[in-house]
Amino acid sequence: SESIGYAMDKAILYGKGSAARMPLGIVTRLAQTVAPSDYPANAPAWVDLHTSNILQIGGDGVTGAEFWAELMQATGATYTRYSRGNMFWAMNSKTYAALKSKLITFTATGDIVANLFGSLPIVTGDIDVLEFMPDGDIVGGYGDLYLWTQRAGMTIEQSREVQFIQDNTVFKGKARADGQPIIPGAFVAININNTEVTTVMDFAADTANDAQL
């Protein structure tokens, strides 16, 4: 079930959309430069967000207040009238450590502190550590504006026959779902190393739907 949960997180961020029989990921939508041919006629007007909501900030020489001011300005691209909910910020542990390093300071008593404990300071919003994300990339926004639909409940099955000789029990978990950001402008992808944001992510082969496999 944990593996399925990580797969869902990865699909929400980087899913390739209906053409690949997958949910449409936040970063994938932000990176679009033209409206897809199957874009729904009754959906809100398609907007090109690949420059306004995919951003590069920071770099080796940017620290302290200057860095946090840049981050605050970049996260402001998530402006929307459609949510008053909490924000989230997904990143890997190296990026989390880099953010923490930019907060290190000495107290009056000589103690070293870095006040970053699961929530992004100043910007606000919970931090979700996902190790499949590239170093330096942060993806986030208003999570309640991503529509996720379970097409079928999660099932977990087991079999002893498939590796009977090895005396192993094999477990198989599966779930079917769809989703897409309903207000894409409520999300942003940022790289804090002043390099390009990764917009394409590899997924394991789909043995259920690909006739070539």
Outline where the language-model segments fall.
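Short secondary-structure boundary/capping segments
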Residues: 33-34, 103-108, 188
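Flexible, glycine/threonine-enriched loop-and-boundary segments that flank and lead into catalytic domains
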Residues: 67-72, 104-108, 152-154
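Alpha-helical scaffold segments that mediate packing/assembly in large oligomeric complexes
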Residues: 1-73, 191-213
